[in-house]
Regions:
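Conserved NTP-donor binding/palm subdomain of two-metal-ion nucleotidyltransferases/polymerases, i.e.
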Residues: 2-189
């Protein structure tokens, strides 16, 4: 977290606020979250399963030569395995949605990840984890949202439901995202 304070030097920023699993700050008007714990699930058994998968994914990230790297303007950025990322980014958006509001940008992030890395997703592992962590129906509704409203090709949605047409639940989900606004801070302007 000391590194974040160094990033603030000479920039407009809001003092960083810490909570049990992340540091939240604003840097030049952009919200930044640095997680010390990737996330957690409610329920001891599900959380233990998720923490184990997180550790295995991070070990794979830093302990093998299969490291996925994104070139961010000449700076290499290590990426977690696509299967873990596909789950984690959606789970993170759902946590925000159920607590403080979710930014539509987070759904776009997940959609773009699937568009770029769908071929690298281990569908069998993802299906098993979605079932174990009780996220199958959530995956399907967000998938309908990504395909029906954001233009993700159905072929790029791992474990796509048979019926991808946005239904009542998908429209309710979309309405909730727009009402809750950007992390609960809706601004009509």
């Amino acid at each position: 977290f000391e590194i974040i304070e160094g990033l603030h030097e000479g920039r407009a920023h809001k003092k960083a606020a810490e909570c049990e699993h992340h540091l939240h700050t604003s840097l030049n008007g952009v919200d930044v979250e640095i997680h010390r714990l990737a996330s957690f699930l409610h329920g001891k058994r599900m959380n233990a399963n998720f923490q184990k998968w997180t550790q295995e994914s991070m070990d794979a990230l830093f302990g093998t030569d299969r490291l996925a790297v994104w070139d961010n303007g000449g700076t290499p950025v290590a990426l977690a395995p696509a299967t873990y990322n596909a789950f984690f980014i959606l789970h993170h958006a759902v946590r925000h949605m159920t607590t403080e509001g979710v930014g539509f940008r987070q759904i776009c992030d997940w959609t773009m990840l699937l568009h770029r890395y769908h071929a690298q997703v281990d569908v069998e592992l993802l299906g098993r984890k979605l079932k174990e962590l009780h996220m199958e129906r959530i995956w399907q509704e967000f998938g309908r949202l990504a395909v029906g409203f954001l233009g993700l090709p159905a072929s790029e949605l791992p474990l796509a439901p048979a019926d991808l047409a946005p239904g009542r639940k998908t429209h309710e989900l979309l309405r909730h995202i727009f009402i809750s606004g950007n992390f609960g801070r809706f601004d009509a302007n």
